[in-house]
Amino acid sequence: MVKYPLILLLIGCAAAQEPRRDGEWPPPAILKLGKHFHDICAPKTGVTDEAIKEFSDGQIHEDEALKCYMNCLFHEFEVVDDNGDVHMEKVLNAIPGEKLRNIMMEASKGCIHPEGDTLCHKAWWFHQCWKKADPVHYFLV
């Protein structure tokens, strides 16, 4: 009899990790802003909308075009230094609104030292780290 509440608890925990997608999340204003950068970076990198959606709403996966798309977004949002390395202070300063900034700060706590041989790989490392840290709120435009 004890196993049924445990199973329900495990199902509830798994469901709680599903990405939030509703009329207010991801924030419509951010999606609108992000479309501009998507329209710049997608053609530059050759990433597919399916790869972006799968990473955002589905499973973390490795795709070179997607990795470079993420790097392009960092450059377009101007959150990198002269060497192309991401600076979290710039990322946080680029995020509008205290609520969204706090969500990002919390998700970033364990995402400080990126791994990767290229800027594209480092960009992907940040994104997969954020998604693992907060799969409910993470989204990719």
From Swiss-Prot:
Lineage summary: Eukaryota, Metazoa, Ecdysozoa, Arthropoda, Hexapoda
SMART domains named in the record: PhBP (SM00708)
Record keyword Transmembrane present: no
One Pfam family matching this protein: PBP_GOBP
Tissue specificity of this protein: Antenna. Mostly expressed in two types of sensory hairs, sensilla trichodea and small sensilla basiconica, in the ventro-lateral region of the third antennal segment (at protein level).
This protein's UniProt keywords: Disulfide bond, Secreted, Signal
GO CC terms: extracellular region; extracellular space
SUPFAM superfamilies reported in the protein's UniProt record: Insect pheromone/odorant-binding proteins
Cysteine pairings via disulfide bonds: C41-C72, C68-C120, C111-C129
Coiled-coil features, chain-numbered ranges: none
Record's protein name: Pheromone-binding protein-related protein 6
Compartments in which it is found: Secreted
